[in-house]
């Protein structure tokens, strides 16, 4: 969208309502619920890790801008897309597999090819947000969706709400 309007996109923001004493995971597009970070906040954390200039990403299952604006992600297939940036010494790549129906489907194989980073070796750090990683909402549902969680449950939810580093490869 920024490209189509020739805007220099420097960051991501959100717009949300926040009301005190609301049920857990009630909505309002907020980034946290009762002090526990929601999975969407981890997306913003990943945006914050991206450095340098945005570079082109292509794929055979990415929705185009017009489809996103006109009808969001409602076709028979998921939007398997990405966002990437690079500077002189690093590259960051964010890949997603998303559909508005919010139904868990099998993982899609993804191949990432990075060109133009002059190095013979690299360290790859992987972060994941899915039903098992960086997702306080899924943990809360597995707890039985408590509206009055115990201190112990809140501690577990707080940990699950953080962006989880899944692997580091050299």
Where are these regions (language model features)?
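Acidic, Ser/Thr/Pro-rich beta/coil linker or hinge segments at domain junctions
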Residues: 108-109, 115-169
């Amino acid at each position: 969208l920024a490209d189509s309007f020739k805007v220099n996109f420097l960051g991501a923001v959100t717009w949300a309502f926040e009301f005190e004493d609301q049920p857990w995971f009630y909505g309002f597009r907020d980034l946290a619920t009762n002090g526990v970070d929601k999975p969407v906040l981890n997306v913003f954390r990943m945006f914050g890790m991206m450095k340098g200039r945005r570079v082109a990403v292509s794929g055979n299952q990415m929705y185009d801008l017009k489809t996103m604006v006109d009808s969001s992600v409602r076709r028979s297939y998921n939007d398997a897309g990405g966002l990437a940036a690079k500077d002189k010494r690093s590259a960051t790549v964010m890949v997603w597999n998303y559909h508005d129906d919010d139904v868990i489907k099998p993982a899609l194989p993804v191949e990432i090819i990075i060109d133009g980073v002059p190095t013979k070796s690299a360290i790859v750090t992987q972060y994941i947000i899915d039903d098992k990683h960086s997702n306080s909402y899924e943990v809360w549902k597995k707890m039985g969706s408590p509206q009055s969680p115990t201190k112990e449950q809140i501690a577990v939810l707080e940990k699950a709400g953080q962006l989880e580093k899944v692997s580091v490869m050299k």
